[in-house]
């Protein structure tokens, strides 16, 4: 349900963009994002930090896009957000010596340090690839292609990354289960 709520503003943006253009789509995205955050707060009593950050960026860049009637602001948002997420993951691992993914999920999952490090680097790489893809698609393809890729391409890539994460973690989770059963 939560993932569906997170996807609704994007689908609304895409639909309104195709039907009415950039300005109306940006306004729709901003309003839908604010409503989404309110609904998340009401239903789940908490909004994750990453959701707040995304919400703030969407509202800020969405307002700029609507005001100037220029899709480039939302294109920059995607690049900045992916770069920011990659930077946070890399800094957590190489500066603070503890992957942020481990800090977030370490209570739910018991994994060896090298697995946490690879997982963290894998997601950092994913965000860097998304950032670079966004730059290429933003500047070398039409706005229509970018809007379609933003809506469906990044969603598909995220799904593939999540599945790859599950496949990577599965053998390690099995080892943890076997260790717990032997104890």
Curated annotation (Swiss-Prot):
Cell location: Cell inner membrane
Tell me which UniProt keywords the record has, alphabetically: Cell inner membrane, Cell membrane, Membrane, Transmembrane, Transmembrane helix
Chief location? membrane
Which first-to-last residue range defines the signal peptide? none
**Keyword Transferase assigned:** no
Q: Where are the transmembrane segments?
A: 19-39, 53-73, 76-96, 121-141, 151-171
Q: How does it sit in the membrane?
A: Multi-pass membrane protein
Specify the domain of life of the species encoding this protein: Bacteria
An annotated GO cellular component of this protein is: plasma membrane
Give the family from UniProt.
Answer: Belongs to the YciB family.
Q: What does this protein do?
A: Plays a role in cell envelope biogenesis, maintenance of cell envelope integrity and membrane homeostasis.
- Supply the name of the protein: Inner membrane-spanning protein YciB
The organism encoding this protein is Actinobacillus pleuropneumoniae serotype 3 (strain JL03)
The upper taxonomy is: Bacteria, Pseudomonadati, Pseudomonadota, Gammaproteobacteria, Pasteurellales
Name of the gene encoding the protein in the UniProt record: yciB
């Amino acid at each position: 349900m939560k993932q569906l709520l997170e996807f609704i503003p994007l689908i609304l943006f895409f639909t309104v963009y195709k039907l009415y253009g950039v300005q109306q789509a940006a306004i729709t995205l901003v309003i839908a994002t604010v409503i989404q955050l309110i609904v998340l707060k009401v239903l789940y009593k908490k909004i994750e930090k990453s959701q707040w950050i995304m919400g703030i960026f969407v509202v800020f860049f969405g307002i700029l896009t609507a005001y100037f009637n220029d899709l480039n602001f939302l294109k920059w948002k995607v690049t900045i957000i992916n770069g920011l997420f990659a930077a946070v993951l890399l800094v957590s691992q190489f500066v603070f010596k503890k992957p942020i993914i481990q800090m977030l999920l370490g209570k739910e999952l018991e994994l060896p340090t090298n697995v946490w490090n690879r997982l963290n680097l894998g997601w950092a790489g994913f965000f860097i690839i998304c950032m670079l893809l966004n730059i290429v698609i933003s500047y070398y393809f039409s706005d229509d292609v970018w809007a379609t890729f933003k809506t469906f391409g990044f969603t598909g890539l995220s799904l593939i990354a999540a599945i790859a994460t599950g496949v990577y973690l599965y053998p390690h989770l099995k080892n943890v289960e076997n260790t717990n059963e032997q104890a």
